[in-house]
Amino acid sequence: MNLRNSIAIVTGGASGLGEATVRYFVGLGARVAVLDLQEGQGAALADEFPGRVKYIRTDVCDEAQVQAAIDQTLETFGAVHVAVSCAGIVEGSKVVGKSNGVFGPHPLDLFSKVIQVNLIGTFNIMRLAAFAMQWNTPNEEGERGVIINTSSVAAFDGQIGQTAYAASKGAIASMTLPAARDLASFGIRVMAIAPGIFETPMLAGLPEEVRESLGKQVPFPSRLGRPVEFARLAASIVENPMLNGEVIRLDGAIRMAPK
């Protein structure tokens, strides 16, 4: 599918990997709806690209809000061809250990929160975007849409304290193939990207020496990943019709140590 003149929705599109994807897609001629809770950053991005980017405040876990966001995208741009899910949270806690200074079992509400945002939020976007995509006129390949979800290397190399996060990202990886099979008859592809350690707002608060140390753990290139590299891969997935039902590690060959 050619990104030029395509319509995409990007969750978590106001910052980090999502923002880079929005900017890259717009540069290739797409129009993009940014679904995010960060109103200031989302609105600023839309102001930067008038007529090309629309910001819609959206909680990806809320069925009604996501459906309303898709409806607004359809009203504004006329279709949804691509959906990229970048919205997510990172929370750490051991199965048994200290949480908020108290020794005990992993807080169940914390585990549920991570699963709700990362997994259920991603699935919510996928199912509702796919329903909108199946009405699209197919291209010459019979293709109607592309869905790209964000997993993580933690799905495969989860570290100490990452049980909830790894579970959420592992589930995203696991549902990629069956979702692709489910949607094949509609001409909709499903892929996932599993990023390694990237320069994102989540790492921005760390001291420079800590970020450099993290980058040196990557075999090659020995640095943190750049958000635009995620965006380039997302664009390549959209434009290559044979990429379907697979999880691509984007990590410089890193394999995470236990801690």
Where are these regions (language model features)?
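Catalytic Tyr-X3-Lys loop
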Residues: 89, 103-126, 147-148, 172
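Conserved mid-core segment of classical short-chain dehydrogenase/reductases
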Residues: 89-112, 131, 135-141, 161-164, ...
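Residue(s) in the substrate-gating loop at a strand-loop-helix junction
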Residues: 152
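Short, small/polar-rich loop/turn modules that mediate ligand/substrate recognition or access, typified
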Residues: 184, 189, 243-246
